Amino acid sequence: MARSVVLVDCHWHLTASEFDHDIGSVLEDAKTIGLCALVAVAEHSGEFEKVIELSRRNAGLVFPCLGVHPVQGSATGPQRSATLQDVEDALPMIEQYRDELVAIGEVGLDFTPRIACTDDQKEEQRNVHSRSAGRPTINLLRDQGAEKVLLHAFDGKPSVAMEGVKAGFYFSIPPSIIRSEQQKLVKQLPLENMCLETDSPALGPEKQVRNEPKNILHSAEYIARVKGISLEEVIEITTKNALKVFPRLCHVLPK
């Protein structure tokens, strides 16, 4: 692969416990395959400090997003729907670190307007979870006047995704696409609306095996095969798309 080719992982979970013992080697492996920017998302305010701390420690490679996932829970307790209190707890910290963030995320259907809904925030970049809620999520974002939107690991119908394309939204494709029922999505989406992600440690090429950012090449290779174009072209265009979604990444990429 040419040295000038660079990759962006638009969505992964840096603070997941699965990475606690070897995060350094995970990041080194990511750099080895050409990843130059990894967008790390948070799901609740309890993760915010760790996301910020690790992004500062790995400045120039890891870039933070802070948000409230629509499903809250832990390994020791049951899952529950996020509440407005979760959002209220998160907002002061999001504001505190706003200058360091590349986007708001991970957010979902119920709370995207609450976190970014004013006229001044319409251009706020958003990293969005829309599982089982593709059409209402797209409609809501469009009604809010959102402009820079990434819908990660979209699981809706391709026809619904095309409504997002018409609104100018982007869709990131994880490595699990090689074994996914969503392969029709890749066939129909224009490459100009695609980005790459891993959603590590989930959505890897193999079930029940920890996913890592280095596996992002599985996404790119699959897209190249389906579209009948070179891997280099897929990487070049998806990276350009990532810079449109996350303009703050522009200055860190090789010229």
From Swiss-Prot:
Record keyword DNA repair present: no
Keyword list, A-Z: Hydrolase, Metal-binding, Nuclease, Nucleus, Zinc
Cofactor: Mn(2+); Ca(2+); Mg(2+); Zn(2+)
Enzyme Commission number(s) from the entry: 3.1.21.-
rRNA-binding listed as a keyword: no
Cofactor: binding details: Binds 2 Zn(2+) per subunit. Exhibits AP endonuclease and 3'-exonuclease activities in the presence of Mg(2+) and Mn(2+). In contrast, in the presence of Ca(2+), shows AP endonuclease activity exclusively.
InterPro entries: Metal_Hydrolase, TatD-like
The organism's place on the tree of life at top rank: Eukaryota
GO cellular component: nucleus
Family: Belongs to the metallo-dependent hydrolases superfamily. TatD-type hydrolase family.
Name listed for the protein in its UniProt record: Putative deoxyribonuclease tatdn3-B
